[in-house]
Amino acid sequence: MTGDKGPQRLSGSSYGSISSPTSPTSPGPQQAPPRETYLSEKIPIPDTKPGTFSLRKLWAFTGPGFLMSIAFLDPGNIESDLQAGAVAGFKLLWVLLWATVLGLLCQRLAARLGVVTGKDLGEVCHLYYPKVPRTVLWLTIELAIVGSDMQEVIGTAIAFNLLSAGRIPLWGGVLITIVDTFFFLFLDNYGLRKLEAFFGLLITIMALTFGYEYVVARPEQGALLRGLFLPSCPGCGHPELLQAVGIVGAIIMPHNIYLHSALVKSREIDRARRADIREANMYFLIEATIALSVSFIINLFVMAVFGQAFYQKTNQAAFNICANSSLHDYAKIFPMNNATVAVDIYQGGVILGCLFGPAALYIWAIGLLAAGQSSTMTGTYAGQFVMEGFLRLRWSRFARVLLTRSCAILPTVLVAVFRDLRDLSGLNDLLNVLQSLLLPFAVLPILTFTSMPTLMQEFANGLLNKVVTSSIMVLVCAINLYFVVSYLPSLPHPAYFGLAALLAAAYLGLSTYLVWTCCLAHGATFLAHSSHHHFLYGLLEEDQKGETSG
C-alpha cells in the first residue's frame, strides 16, 4: 500500500489499523506518491462555518452519488420494473420502495469506507484477504461487471432497433455499442465535473422520457398510493413472488458497492480531522439519498406505466390494440392467444406506441438508450477500480473497456444473430438473477470492513447498523436460495445437475469464508485463526511495509 506509515498499536497488541496519509489516525508525512486512477482529479471542498449546513458544500460533494445511482436505472432494472408492473400491477411498488432503501443503506457503507480509510473496497480486500479467496472474489465481481455490461448492450441494441423502426437489426445494435463506448471514454478528458454533469444529463433524459410515459398512461393514483405504502399483495402467487425477489436482485448491484467506495475519493477531504470526515459522511449520505430518490421515482414511473397498460392483458388484447393502431406492423410480435402477455423492454416500447401513439415508442427508446449509455460508463469505472484495487494492476482505459465489452458482446451478438428477440430478453432476465446471486460477494466484505474498529475507528458500524445490514444479508441469501430452488427443476438435462452442484459447492465455499471473516470482524474471537487475526486486531506492521515496498 503506497505511502503507508506504521500502524498505531492497539493496547498490548502487535496489530494496528490501516494507516496511510489519508487515515484519520495518521496525518504523518507522505512516503511516496499515492496510487492514482484515471479519476485522479480532486474536487476542492469550500470552507464554511463549522457546524452549519451549506448548499455550496453539498454542491461540491454532489456527483459520486448520482454516478452510483445510474446502476439503479440500467436496462436490467427497467425490464424488472415493467415486468413487475405487467405481472402484479401496482401491488409490488412497496417492494421497489424498500429495495431502494436497502440499496441506500449498502451504498452508505461503501461511501463511509472510502471516506474514512481513503481506500476503496477493492483495495481493502487486497490488504485483508489471502491470495486465493481474494482472487476468487475478484473473479466473481468481474463476472458481475460483465453481466451488467451485457444488460447495457442488450438495452442499447433494442433502443437502436426501436428508433430505426427495425432497420438496424439487433446484432447491428450490439456492434454499434463497440463504437459508442470508446466515444464516451474521451469525456473524462474534459474534467471530472463536466463528466458528472453529463451523467446528470442522461438521468434527466430518463426522468423526462419515462415521466412522459407516466403522464400519457395516467395510472390510477389511488391504487398506486396503496401499492406504494401498504406492504401487501392480495391475490398474489408464485409469479408475483418471483417478480418481488427479482426487484431486489435488480436494484442492489454488487459492482456498484465497489464503485461508490472509489468515487468518493474524488473529493479533497482532510482525513487527519475527524470533523471533516464526519462532515463528508453526512454530505455524501444526503447526496446519495437525493440521487436514489430520483432513481426511485424513475423506476416508479416505469412500473406504474406498465401496471396500468399491461396488467392482466392477454396476447390477443395486445395484438388487437396494435392491429388497430398506426403501428399495425408490430402486431405480429404478439401471439394470437389468450395467455397473459409476457412483456419485455422491446414489447414494452411497442405496446406504448400502439396505445399512445408513435411518439411514446420513440420517447421510450430514447430513455432506454440513455439508460444503456450511462450504465456503460459507470460499468467501465467499476471495472477499472476493481482491477486496480484487487490486483494492483493498472490498465489503460482503452484496454479495460475492450476487455469488458468484448466479454459482453461475444455472447450477446451470438444470441442476437442465431436466436430471436425473446431469447435476448430472456438473457436479460437471467443476468438479473446472476446479479442477485453475486450480491453477497459485495455486501459481506463491506459489512466486514465497516464493522472493524481497528480499521474504521469511531466510524465503525454501531449495533443498529450491524443489525440492519446483517438483515439485508439474510434477505439476499433467502432470495438467492429461492431463485436456485425455483430454477433447478427447469434444467434441461440431468447432466446439468452435476455442473450446478460444482458451482454451488464453490459458491458456498466462498460465501462461508466471507461469513467467517465477517464474524471475526464483529468480535467472534473464538473463531480466530492465527493467519486471520488482522480481522480482529488490524494489520501487522510488516504487512503494511510489504504493501509499501510492493
Curated annotation (Swiss-Prot):
Low complexity bias locations: 11-23
Induction: In response to lymphokine or bacterial products.
Name of the protein described by the UniProt record: Natural resistance-associated macrophage protein 1
Listed Pfam families: Nramp
Recorded GO CC terms: endosome membrane; ficolin-1-rich granule membrane; late endosome; late endosome membrane; lysosomal membrane; lysosome; phagocytic vesicle membrane; plasma membrane
InterPro entries in the cross-refs: NRAMP_fam
Keywords: Endosome, Glycoprotein, Ion transport, Iron, Iron transport, Lysosome, Membrane, Transmembrane, Transmembrane helix, Transport
Cytoplasmic side: 1-58, 106-142, 188-196, 260-287, 370-400, 451-466, 517-550
Annotated region described as Disordered, given as residue ranges: 1-45
Family of the protein in this entry: Belongs to the NRAMP family.
Catalytic activity: Zn(2+)(in) + H(+)(out) = Zn(2+)(out) + H(+)(in); Fe(2+)(in) + H(+)(out) = Fe(2+)(out) + H(+)(in); Mn(2+)(in) + H(+)(out) = Mn(2+)(out) + H(+)(in)
Expression tissues: Macrophages; peripheral blood leukocytes, lung, spleen and liver.
Main location: membrane
Domain of life: Eukaryota
Name of the gene encoding the protein in the UniProt record: SLC11A1
GO terms under biological process: antigen processing and presentation of peptide antigen; antimicrobial humoral response; cadmium ion transmembrane transport; cell redox homeostasis; cellular detoxification of cadmium ion; defense response to bacterium; defense response to Gram-negative bacterium; defense response to protozoan
TM annotation in the entry: 59-76, 86-105, 143-163, 168-187, 197-217, 241-259, 288-307, 350-369, 401-418, 430-450, 467-488, 497-516
Species, as recorded: Homo sapiens (Human)
GO MF, one example: protein homodimerization activity
Localization in the cell: Late endosome membrane; Lysosome membrane
Extracellular membrane side: 77-85, 164-167, 218-240, 308-349, 419-429, 489-496
Positions annotated as glycosylated: 324, 338
Protein's membrane topology: Multi-pass membrane protein
Function: Macrophage-specific antiporter that fluxes metal ions in either direction against a proton gradient. Localized to late endosomal lysosomal membranes, delivers bivalent cations from the cytosol into these acidic compartments where they may directly affect antimicrobial activity. Involved in iron metabolism and host natural resistance to infection with intracellular parasites.
